[in-house]
Amino acid sequence: MLDLKRIRTNPEEIKKALTNRGEDFDISVIDELVSLDEERRKNLVEVENLKSKRNKDSGEIAKLKKSGQNADELLAEMKKISDDIKGIDAKVSEIDEKMQYIMLRIPNIPHPSVPEGKSDEENVEIRKWGEPRKFDFEFKAHWDIGTDLGLLDFERGGKVAGSRFTFYKGLGARLERAVINYFLDTHVEKHGYTEILPPYMVNRVSMTGTGQLPKFEEDAFKVDNGFFLIPTAEVPVTNMFRDEILKAEDLPYKFAAYSACFRSEAGSAGRDTRGLVRQHQFNKVELVKFAKPEESYDELEKLTHDAEEILQILNIPYRVVRICKGDLGFTAALKYDIEVWMPSYGRYVEISSCSNFEDFQARRANIKFRRDPKAKPEFVHTLNGSGLAVGRTVAAILENYQNEDGSVNVPEALKKYIGKDVIR
């Protein structure tokens, strides 16, 4: 959520910043919001004037009654004033609802460094690591490798739950678990994150706090009693501090959270339908930070590096792209995508998004910090990034480490978790 004062003060600047934002967003609602805000402020001034008049009349009535004089006229006037105040309060409440409706649907303001562009084709590559492997045999896609080795069972996953669900079996399940443990151990022991195992269901307030609702409700799995299955651990971990005031000396908070994630993938029909890249249920280790505003962009660079280092240790080629304005999404002010090389696709595929939301989520979730005990609370900056998506990492390992005989070498970093050098 944006700062209303900023919108009120610089509506044209806001509209310019949100032009070509890539969201289905009508910038004319900024003018509507400013108009509603002006109307609200006028009504509040009127209420204060009426309350002042009522207090004055109350004093006059007390004097009249004390002297035995008739106060009926003033009493009638006071009743009318009270009725008028109730009417204006009701009008203000209605305006508040309209403003809240608009505010929750305004996307974040892009950071000045975000490149112009309308789609992912205009994202800017900023660095590459490693060289894509050149095979001297006909390589296979990870879904074929997984099926042939008995690691993945897409057919029975579909039978049990439907399309885009998968059984991991035997060494496939062990590989998935090994990747999770490797991610967590690296982020906790080497990068200094605190491990979190969060709830897999959250309430509507939590989904609204991180920006999934109301805009992306169709992408969420809703269950009974107002709960939602989490699309990412970002939601419960960020909302851990909802409606709290943090201490400046405790910042930055750094959390690494493993969870299953659940997404309906509405609107993605026909995209990456085979394999592990786009599933309704998948595992992920999420990195979440809470930082002081002046430190948040340094923390974003560190977070992105932490995610990259995972792939460097696994020795899997990847690149980092800066996301352009039109592909930025709803909540981020600045976003990097880390894309891993997938031979079967012949291209780099997203395996992590690392974002700084500035105070956008903190305003929605009311997360503040205090620089010292007497200081006015300020909104924190929130950041997160995948560290990494587990299924996509497994897919990248199967494809990049495959052998001509159909077996798969185990990356050095995972051997202690799996207890094997080769999966065959």
From Swiss-Prot:
Pathway: Aminoacyl-tRNA biosynthesis; selenocysteinyl-tRNA(Sec) biosynthesis; L-seryl-tRNA(Sec) from L-serine and tRNA(Sec): step 1/1. Keywords: Aminoacyl-tRNA synthetase, ATP-binding, Cytoplasm, Ligase, Nucleotide-binding, Protein biosynthesis. L-serine binds at T232, A233, E234, E286, S386. It comes from the Bacteria. Its EC number is 6.1.1.11. GO terms for molecular function: ATP binding; catalytic activity, acting on a protein; serine-tRNA ligase activity; transferase activity. It is an enzyme of class 6 (ligase). ATP binds at R263, S264, E265, E350, I351, S352, S353. It catalyses: tRNA(Ser) + L-serine + ATP = L-seryl-tRNA(Ser) + AMP + diphosphate + H(+); tRNA(Sec) + L-serine + ATP = L-seryl-tRNA(Sec) + AMP + diphosphate + H(+). One of its GO terms (cellular component) is cytoplasm. InterPro entries: aa-tRNA-synt_IIb (IPR002314), aa-tRNA-synth_II (IPR006195), aa-tRNA-synth_II/BPL/LPL (IPR045864), Ser-tRNA-ligase_type_1 (IPR002317), Ser-tRNA-synth_1_N (IPR015866), SerRS_1_N_sf (IPR042103), SerRS_core (IPR033729), tRNA-bd_arm (IPR010978). It is found in: Cytoplasm. Its main location: cytoplasm. One of its GO terms (biological process) is selenocysteine biosynthetic process. Homodimer. The tRNA molecule binds across the dimer. PANTHER family: SERINE--TRNA LIGASE, SERYL-TRNA SYNTHETASE. Consists of two distinct domains, a catalytic core and a N-terminal extension that is involved in tRNA binding. Belongs to the class-II aminoacyl-tRNA synthetase family. Type-1 seryl-tRNA synthetase subfamily. Catalyzes the attachment of serine to tRNA(Ser). Is also able to aminoacylate tRNA(Sec) with serine, to form the misacylated tRNA L-seryl-tRNA(Sec), which will be further converted into selenocysteinyl-tRNA(Sec). This is Serine--tRNA ligase 1. It comes from Clostridium acetobutylicum (strain ATCC 824 / DSM 792 / JCM 1419 / IAM 19013 / LMG 5710 / NBRC 13948 / NRRL B-527 / VKM B-1787 / 2291 / W). The gene is serS1.
